[in-house]
């Protein structure tokens, strides 16, 4: 059936990605992080990895729509969500929505930007430019909200820590 390992792994990845598909209340097809759609939401970090490493299994328009879904659910100050559930609940920090693990994740906007970058690499530049123009100000605002120390590094205050993933150092 398969002529090589790469073909087999691509087929397996496609099946897993297909199992991640859920339809949100607003009709947006989103991708959950677990391959069986039991997580009821779009996690920006996991989706970014999915697009980068198994994006061949996701139509460009679904990626565009997931980015739009995330941007629509940013906080009033511009902070991007950690995840957005199928019913539209935006959650900004790791953990249970009612009991977050620290302040909002420091990597929400950076991972959304990684997704935008992955999309840009697979689209014709002329087709991508209007999308980037649509998102640029919101992505920039999300980046400018990140706490930066005197050396220009993302800063995670140990007295009031954000939920980190690896883009920060805690003092």
What are the residue ranges of the model-derived segments?
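Low-complexity, Ser/Thr/Pro/Gly-enriched N-terminal "stalk/linker" regions
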Residues: 1-42, 64-65, 69, 78-80
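Soluble or luminal CAZymes and related metallo-dependent hydrolases
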Residues: 4, 131-134
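Alpha-helical scaffold segments in carbohydrate-active enzymes
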Residues: 11, 15, 69-76, 118, ...
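The feature captures the catalytic groove of carbohydrate-active enzymes
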Residues: 30, 36-38, 82-111, 117-121, ...
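Short hydrophobic/aromatic segments of transmembrane alpha-helices and their interfaces
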Residues: 31-33, 45-46, 136-137
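Aromatic- and histidine-enriched alpha-helix N-cap/loop-to-helix transition segments
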Residues: 38-49, 58, 103-114, 134
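Alpha-helical support elements that line or immediately flank enzyme active sites
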Residues: 46-77
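Short, solvent-exposed positions on alpha-helices
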Residues: 61-64, 126, 130
């Amino acid at each position: 059936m398969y002529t090589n390992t790469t073909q087999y792994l691509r087929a397996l990845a496609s099946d897993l990605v297909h199992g991640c598909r859920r339809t949100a209340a607003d009709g947006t097809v989103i991708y959950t992080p677990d391959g069986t759609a039991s997580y009821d939401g779009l996690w920006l970090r996991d989706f970014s990895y999915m697009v980068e490493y198994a994006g061949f299994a996701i139509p460009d328009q679904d990626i565009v729509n997931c980015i739009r879904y995330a941007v629509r659910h940013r906080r009033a100050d511009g902070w991007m969500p950690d995840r957005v559930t199928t019913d539209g609940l935006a959650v900004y920090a790791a953990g249970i929505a009612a009991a977050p693990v620290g302040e909002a994740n420091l990597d929400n906007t950076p991972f959304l930007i990684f997704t935008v970058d992955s999309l840009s690499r697979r689209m014709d530049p002329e087709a991508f430019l209007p999308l980037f123009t649509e998102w640029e100000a919101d992505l920039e605002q999300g980046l400018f909200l990140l706490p930066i120390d005197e050396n220009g590094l993302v800063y995670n205050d140990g007295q009031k820590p954000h939920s980190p993933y690896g883009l920060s150092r805690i003092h």
